[in-house]
Swiss-Prot record:
PROSITE patterns: ATP_P_PHORIBOSYLTR. Catalyzes the condensation of ATP and 5-phosphoribose 1-diphosphate to form N'-(5'-phosphoribosyl)-ATP (PR-ATP). Has a crucial role in the pathway because the rate of histidine biosynthesis seems to be controlled primarily by regulation of HisG enzymatic activity. The gene is hisG2. It is an enzyme of class 2 (transferase). This is ATP phosphoribosyltransferase 2. Its EC number is 2.4.2.17. GO terms for biological process: L-histidine biosynthetic process. It is found in: Cytoplasm. GO terms for cellular component: cytoplasm. GO terms for molecular function: ATP binding; ATP phosphoribosyltransferase activity. It comes from Geobacter sulfurreducens (strain ATCC 51573 / DSM 12127 / PCA).
Length: 212
């Protein structure tokens, strides 16, 4: 089955949009949306295999060659910095990676005057590099969810997190202060697979490119 193309995709909205996008280039993977606990799906007719994995694990499966292609948010790629080929911005799943703080603090706060701050985030690597470029010393507290809670209980003054509509921030009394990056979903490719399966992978990339 070495001639199969294996794609790693995370669950959730990215999975739904990916299935729709692949359908536009004749790759039928509707089975991925079925109510099942299966993690591997195979389409023998099209010689395709799909792996359902955690979003943060997609780059690892692709880097080690367990998957030829992967679909994942740019935020994960920025944080992990894997050695991967990233040929295509799929242009869905848009959000912003932001620095946010309590609205009361923001009233007379000047980010350009920051010298030593504490930040809670799921993205310690991105956060550290961002503030290092600005010459700001930062103490980073790594969290895995509900980042907005940190300023409310005094764990940190500020957070770095993804923001879509901003509604969650507003409901928790936080405001956006700085934008670190704009985030969308990306197609990633294992570098060895790009050489050994070049015709098929190139066909997929070029097909998707026409629909994004």
């Amino acid at each position: 089955m070495t001639d199969y193309i294996t794609i790693a995709i995370p669950k959730g909205r990215i999975l739904e949009e990916s299935v729709t996008l692949f359908g536009k280039i004749g790759i039928n993977c509707d089975e991925l949306l079925s109510n099942t606990r299966k993690l591997i799906f195979e389409n023998h007719e099209q010689r395709m295999r799909y792996m359902i994995v955690r979003a943060t694990d997609v780059p690892t499966y692709v880097e080690y060659g367990c998957a030829d292609l992967g679909i994942v948010g740019k935020d994960t790629l920025m944080e992990q910095e894997k050695d991967l080929y990233e040929p295509l911005d799929l242009k869905f799943g848009y959000c912003r990676m932001m620095v946010a703080e309590p609205a009361g603090l923001a009233l007379d706060d000047d980010p350009s005057s920051w010298t030593n701050i504490r930040i809670a985030t799921k993205y310690p690597n991105v956060t550290e590099k961002y503030f290092a470029r600005k010459g700001v010393q930062v103490e980073i507290i790594k969290l895995y969810g509900s980042i907005e809670l940190a300023p409310l209980v005094g764990l940190s003054e500020r957070i770095v997190d993804l923001v879509s509509t901003g509604e969650t921030l507003r409901q928790n009394g936080l405001v956006e202060v700085e934008t670190i990056a704009e985030i969308t979903t990306r197609l990633i490719v294992n570098r060895a697979s790009l050489k050994t399966k070049h015709p098929r992978i190139t066909e997929i990339i070029e097909g998707l490119e026409k629909h994004v």
